[in-house]
Amino acid sequence: MLLSDRDILAAQSAGHISLDPWTPEMVQPASIDVRLDRYFRLFNNHAYTYVDPAENQGALTEQFEVAPDEPWILHPGEFALGSTWEYVKLDPSIAARLEGKSSLGRLGILTHSTAGFIDPGFEGHITLELSNVSTLPVKLWPGMKIGQMCFFQLSSPAEHPYGSKGTGSHYQGQRGPTPSRSYENFYRAHIDD
């Protein structure tokens, strides 16, 4: 069940959903707006000749920080990692999705490539996969609305929520834009002809 504004407020009050900082004015009819932090990661295009999700390529991205009152420019065709300002906590009975803001989408800004789902039990800053598919550079300001989270009540609490042993939860408690850790539990099935 998708939570309405009143359900979001009740879940926050009961401790099932936590966003820090909590700003009630960010609550929308069926979502809550989240804001952009000032930390970003860009690809270091000279460190590797290719990306391999099975390998630890620690120098693949470099983190940088912009001043709280300074914009960062995302150029056409550029991809960068960012993060929400809000630290998010979900209890085992709530899952969430991160969606873009339509006003930013109309400017060519994509908030996430594929990783919009947030598991029950997750806590941390949400890493954003930012892309500019427009033909002009776009200023991104720390603290601006960058996306919206909608919440789903599970039919029963997850038996093994994100962060519990054996779930491969390698982003639990993340701070800032966190690079891929796909190599930590890379899986590849053997395919026969």
Swiss-Prot record:
Binding site for dCTP: K101, S102, S103, L104, G105, R106, D119, T127, L128, E129, Q148, Y162, Q174
InterPro entries assigned to the protein according to its UniProt record, in alphabetical order: dCTP_deaminase (IPR011962), dUTPase-like_sf (IPR036157), dUTPase_trimeric (IPR033704)
Pfam families: DCD
Superkingdom: Bacteria
One GO MF term: nucleotide binding
Pathway(s) this gene product operates in, as recorded in its UniProt entry: Pyrimidine metabolism; dUMP biosynthesis; dUMP from dCTP: step 1/1
Protein name, entry field: dCTP deaminase, dUMP-forming
Organism from which the protein derives: Bifidobacterium longum (strain NCC 2705)
